């Protein structure tokens, strides 16, 4: 590969690291083509970009970041990088689900907001984080709860009055 091509590739990888919300570094040694293709499909469905990149190109692309030295220790052997742009936990969730059926896929490290995570931390912490949609639903439920309680309090006297009338009606029916 010519030097100019390498520079373009390094620039492309650098741009991915600048845009990402998180990244997961994987070792796919021992996996067959079918399994790797299935993994790529799962990443694509989740909006995660996955690419196999030479370790030296990644090192050059991240060298200006303060966490580069720490991450470089994990960049050995074959490395696949999964970048999440929207949902920080998307790549980790795909990897965790995929590893249930394929233990050959190994997590080397993770990266989120400048923090390097171990492979175990990616699987136990990052993969269990709620996604954007889950957080939105939780926020919406939290915002709606006081309003729903207020409406219930407003309706309570009417309900109680209706129960009272029904009880009086049943009592009158028993006396007759």
Swiss-Prot record:
Name the record gives this protein: Large ribosomal subunit protein uL10
Function: Forms part of the ribosomal stalk, playing a central role in the interaction of the ribosome with GTP-bound translation factors.
Complexes and interactors: Part of the ribosomal stalk of the 50S ribosomal subunit. The N-terminus interacts with L11 and the large rRNA to form the base of the stalk. The C-terminus forms an elongated spine to which L12 dimers bind in a sequential fashion forming a multimeric L10(L12)X complex.
UniProt keyword terms in alphabetical order: Ribonucleoprotein, Ribosomal protein, RNA-binding, rRNA-binding
GO biological process: translation
Gene name, Swiss-Prot/TrEMBL: rplJ
PANTHER family: 39S RIBOSOMAL PROTEIN L10, MITOCHONDRIAL (PTHR11560)
Keyword Ribonucleoprotein: yes
Higher taxonomy: Bacteria, Pseudomonadati, Myxococcota, Polyangia, Polyangiales
Family: Belongs to the universal ribosomal protein uL10 family.
Keyword flag Lyase: no
A GO term for molecular function: structural constituent of ribosome
Gene Ontology CC annotations of this record: large ribosomal subunit
Entries under InterPro entries matching the protein: Ribosomal_uL10, Ribosomal_uL10-like_sf, Ribosomal_uL10_bac, Ribosomal_uL10_bac_type, Ribosomal_uL10_CS_bac
């Amino acid at each position: 590969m010519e030097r100019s091509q390498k520079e373009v590739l390094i620039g492309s990888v650098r741009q991915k690291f600048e845009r990402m919300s998180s990244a997961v570094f994987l070792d796919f040694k021992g996996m067959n083509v079918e399994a790797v293709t299935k993994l790529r499909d799962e990443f694509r469905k989740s909006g995660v970009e996955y690419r196999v990149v030479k370790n030296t190109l990644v090192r050059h692309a991240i060298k200006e970041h303060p966490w580069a030295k720490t991450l470089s220790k994990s960049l050995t052997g074959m490395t696949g990088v999964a970048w999440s742009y929207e949902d920080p936990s998307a790549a980790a969730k795909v990897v965790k689900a995929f590893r249930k059926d394929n233990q050959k896929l190994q997590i080397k490290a993770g990266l989120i907001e400048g923090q390097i995570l171990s492979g175990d931390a990616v699987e136990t912490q990052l993969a269990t984080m709620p996604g954007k949609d889950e957080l939105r639903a939780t926020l919406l439920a939290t915002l709606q709860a006081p309003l729903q309680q207020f409406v219930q309090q407003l309706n309570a006297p009417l309900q109680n009055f209706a129960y009272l009338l029904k009880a009086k009606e049943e009592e009158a029916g028993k006396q007759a």
